[in-house]
Curated annotation (Swiss-Prot):
Acetyl-CoA carboxylase is a heterohexamer composed of biotin carboxyl carrier protein (AccB), biotin carboxylase (AccC) and two subunits each of ACCase subunit alpha (AccA) and ACCase subunit beta (AccD). HAMAP family: AcetylCoA_CT_beta (MF_01395). GO terms for cellular component: acetate CoA-transferase complex. Transmembrane segments: none annotated. GO terms for biological process: fatty acid biosynthetic process; malonyl-CoA biosynthetic process. The lineage of its organism: Bacteria, Pseudomonadati, Pseudomonadota, Alphaproteobacteria, Caulobacterales. This is Acetyl-coenzyme A carboxylase carboxyl transferase subunit beta.
Length: 308
């Protein structure tokens, strides 16, 4: 009877067996252990730090709270979220903003103005600091204008001025109120006197609304300062403000350095301005749609609400 041949291990098998003998059982489970403790991919900005308390807040919780922290801080938000939170069910039509001639002064403050515009557009996804939407707010049709502080500090320039005028004209064409959410550090220095001209032009646009008998409601958000405060932000029929919003012309530090006195606690904040009669009501973000709908419905009651 022929004896069975013992298989001769291949070269690769010999190497594997030798490695297992050297490492023992640990070598067999090591790959699984390494996989279990390997660095995992985690989404960026998973946590957001509260500017008041330093608490780390889970981003999804903050989104569910409309970007209002447990401490009550109303975080700054852009046009997309503002439209989503303001219009009924978030449904709205985005209206175009006019194009303008860019950088007429060929301005550079260490970085060309055109490069700053390009960087702001890439960061925000917006063409400029103004965005316009049309839809229903608390059941009332309205044109809503949102100023984006993330776009070069929401500064008022030619494009923003044209955007405001376009929003006013859209409201007149549709015979509906205009609601403006303001957020700005002032006029855009890179456009010089051309930016200051927008203060007068936006004021004329508001006069057009008044001549048409249409309401103009302003919601002041953090921060609203400079030339914006000195023009369309303070010309509304009704002024609402989000809690804790900084509202004024010059900032508190500039004022303190000028008058060399300490300002009262909460100076220039929305709650302080309500006490002084500069703002009609401080309204939390979650209540804004219902409050705006009630105000718009009341102001339009004499002529009946119309939808375009």
């Amino acid at each position: 009877m022929a004896m069975a041949e013992t298989p001769v291990p291949k070269k690769g098998d010999k190497t594997k067996v030798a490695a297992e003998r050297r490492g023992g059982w640990l070598s067999r489970i090591a790959p699984g252990v390494r996989g279990a403790f390997a660095k995992r991919e985690t989404p960026e900005n998973l946590w957001v730090k509260c500017p008041d308390t330093g608490e780390m807040i889970y981003r999804s919780d903050l989104e569910a709270a409309l970007w209002v922290t447990p401490a009550g801080r109303h975080m700054r938000i852009g046009p997309e979220l503002r439209f989503k939170f303001t219009f009924d069910d978030g449904e709205h039509e985005v209206l175009p903003t006019p194009a303008v001639f860019e950088d007429p002064l060929r301005f550079s403050d260490g970085k060309p103005y055109k490069e700053r515009l390009a960087a702001a557009r890439k960061a925000t996804g917006e063409q400029d600091a103004m965005a316009i939407g049309y839809g229903k707010v608390g059941g009332a049709p309205a044109v809503v204008l949102v100023q984006d502080f993330a776009f070069m500090g929401g500064s008022l320039g030619m494009a923003a001025g044209e955007g405001f005028i376009a929003a006013a004209e859209a409201a007149i064409a549709r015979q509906v109120p205009l609601v403006a959410f303001t957020a700005a550090g002032g006029a855009r220095m890179q456009e010089g006197a051309l930016s200051l001209m927008q203060m007068a032009r936006t004021t004329l646009a508001i006069n057009m609304l008044k001549d048409a008998g249409l309401p103009y409601v302003v919601v002041l958000t953090d921060p609203t300062t400079g030339g914006v405060t000195a023009s369309y932000a303070m010309l509304g029929d009704v002024h609402l403000a989000e809690p804790g919003a900084l509202i004024g012309f010059a900032g508190p530090r500039v004022i303190e350095q000028t008058i060399r006195e300490t300002l009262p606690p909460g100076f220039q904040r929305s709650e302080y301005l309500v006490e002084k009669g500069m703002v009609d009501r401080v309204t939390p973000r979650k209540e804004l749609p219902a409050v705006l709908g009630s105000i718009l419905g009341t102001l339009m009651m004499g002529r009946g609400l119309k939808a375009a």
